[in-house]
Amino acid sequence: KEILKSAVEKLNSEDVMPCLATVLVGDDPASATYVKNKHNACKKIGIKTMDHKLSADTTQKELDKIINNLNNDKEVHGILVQLPLPKQLNEFATVCRISPIKDVDGLTPQNVGLLSMGKSILKPCTPSGIMEMFYYYKINLEGKNVVMINRSNLIGKPLYHLLSQNNATVITCHSKTKNLNEHCKNAD
């Protein structure tokens, strides 16, 4: 937190006020809590936030317009569209609409591609936090067998790339994996 707070203060001294815009469609309690926690975390380190709460019956056109406006707003530095979206909305099209330089979740095709090539500018938060824990505790991943039970676009797939880039041998397991117990026994 202190490193982030210091970075925000440096940006402020250069007349840049970092701002995260969140977009929440619908009234899913877990999603609302997640977004609220993001706003609270930003507030603690001095990042301004914008909260866009949309009804569950929002159309793709309405959502696209909001994302376009946020992409074009020079005061907004990051955009987070809370997933999952209601069924009438296209998650892939929505993510693709976010400007890659404002994509804080690292889900746009451009950011996913850069991450897979080890050239990412923005890395997804949770996988980055997991890697920071390895660095903090000085855990060398080189040559280690890592079994990961997650293949989601937000956590599992990015974490796979980050672990591989640190020379770990990564086995990705999921709900259809057979002999999960055996895979886990072989993990370091």
Q: Which residues make up each language-model segment?
A:
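Short beta-strand segments enriched in small/hydrophobic residues
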Residues: M17-D27
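Short beta-strand elements in bilobed, periplasmic/extracellular small-molecule ligand-binding domains
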Residues: L20, C42-A56, V170-C173
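Glycine/small-residue-rich loop that forms an oxyanion/phosphate-binding "nest" at active or ligand-binding sites
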Residues: N72, Q82-S128
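Glycine-rich phosphate/diphosphate-binding loop of Rossmann-like nucleotide-binding domains
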Residues: V25-N40, I121-D188
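Short beta-strand segments
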Residues: L24, L80-P84, I149
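Non-catalytic terminal and connector segments of soluble metabolic enzymes
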Residues: K44-G46, N69-N71, I98-I101, C184
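Positively charged, low-complexity intrinsically disordered leader regions
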Residues: K1-V16
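Short, well-structured alpha-helical segments in soluble
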Residues: E62-K74
